[in-house]
């Protein structure tokens, strides 16, 4: 593996909040910050941290540079959020991170055969990162009050249509 992966700890990893610049907030659902997002899902009915909901922080050269939140539901891994530190964006890190995430069961505790992600139409960087990692655009998806796009991964083959 290229990266070191650690479990997110909301009490010691406050630096992730600083990664949420205006661009990141506009392209994610993290208007209230990553910690609030994490606390919401960690306490949501049907979700249990370490059982079907996780957040992992990726490190490169002992420096944290990305966080990924995901859950397991109906034999799929749903990627809920990916945030990369601003100075590492637009360098191919997102697709490399996603590929490593998908290909290494030790990160998630199980092999990922199917995965989904919902991406906003104006988030071109995320669309490219997910496509380069093997995801395919499936269809438009209504996500609360904002139009979104569903991307799917099935070992690199799109059979969701």
PLM features per residue range, with description:
Residues 89, 115-127, 144-145:
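Conserved beta-strand-loop-alpha-helix junction that forms the acyl-donor binding cleft
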Residues 105-119:
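Conserved GNAT acetyl-CoA-binding A-motif
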Residues 92:
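Glycine-rich phosphate-binding loop
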Residues 95, 121-139:
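Conserved active-site alpha-helix within GNAT-family acetyltransferase domains
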Residues 59-61, 153-156:
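Active-site beta-strand termini and strand-to-loop segments that position acidic
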Residues 116-118, 134-151:
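Conserved catalytic-core motifs of GNAT/GCN5-like acyltransferases
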Residues 7-14, 19-81, 85-87, 98, ...:
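Acetyl-CoA-dependent GNAT
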Residues 1-14, 18, 154-161:
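Conserved N-terminal entry element of GNAT/NAT acetyltransferase domains
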């Amino acid at each position: 593996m290229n990266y070191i992966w650690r479990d997110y700890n909301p009490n010691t990893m406050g630096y992730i909040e600083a990664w949420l610049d205006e661009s990141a907030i506009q392209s994610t659902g993290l208007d209230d910050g990553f910690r609030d997002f994490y606390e919401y899902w960690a306490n949501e009915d049907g979700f249990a941290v370490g059982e079907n909901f996780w957040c992992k922080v990726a490190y490169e050269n002992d420096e944290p540079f990305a966080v990924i939140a995901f859950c397991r539901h109906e034999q799929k891994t749903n990627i809920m959020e990916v945030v990369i530190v601003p100075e590492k964006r637009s360098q191919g890190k997102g697709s490399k991170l996603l590929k490593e995430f998908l290909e290494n069961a030790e990160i998630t505790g199980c092999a990922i055969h199917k995965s989904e992600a919902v991406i906003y139409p104006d988030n071109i960087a995320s669309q490219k990162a997910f496509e380069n990692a093997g995801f395919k655009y499936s269809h438009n998806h209504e996500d609360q009050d904002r139009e979104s796009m569903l991307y799917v991964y099935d070992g690199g083959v799109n059979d969701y249509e």
